[in-house]
Amino acid sequence: MSPPLSPLIHLIDDDDAVRSSLSLLISTVGLRVQEWADPHAFVRGFDRDGIGVIVLDVRMPGISGLTVLADLMAQGVDQPVVMLTGHGTVDMCRRAFKAGAAEFLEKPVDDELLLEALQNGVRQHVKSRERTQIDRDARARYAHLSEREREVLSLIVAGLTNKEMGRAMDVSPRTVEAHRANLFAKLEAESLAQLVRRYAALIDELSAQPPGA
């Protein structure tokens, strides 16, 4: 089995010298780099599934990096984006962060600041993907619950005791305990705290939906 690939940094800048210099710097910390001179080609062809960070120049011929950033966010791209500019202003910085940038750095770029931003971005992306997978798994398990089990889950998340749940469902506490045990097994929850953490937001989301949605 081949070892997993290191995170991939997408470097988008129309200046060949800048790309070459930054690519060399980034590779020194074990990160892979893919260079792009054309932002349009990048948007069309980059790997959206892999772990990594996007480094995007603000000023490029024909299109602003801020426009590219807005397009990426609109398409649901989840890789963190580090913006670079040689002509930064407070307004430009504000617009970049408002559009979804993870970091905004001025050229000439401080090596340590850039590497720190990339390493933070990679950690952020890994955690984001892990949360997404946990949420996806939780939804899949929830879909296999019976109506009764979903009712029990909602009452657990609401903080009811076994006795209170028994009264609400018109069943004995022992029946509630059996339902809880089955629920914990089906949802692969190791503790009450884990169960609530994984499913509270989902229960709230589903409760807010109109009937039949």
Q: Which residues fall in each region the model found?
A:
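Active-site residues of response regulator receiver
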Residues: 57, 85
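Basic, Lys/Arg-enriched C-terminal extension of HTH/homeodomain DNA-binding domains
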Residues: 181-213
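Recognition helix of helix-turn-helix DNA-binding domains
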Residues: 161-194
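Active-site beta3 strand of CheY-like receiver
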Residues: 10, 49-55
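Acidic catalytic/metal-coordinating carboxylates
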Residues: 37-38, 64-67
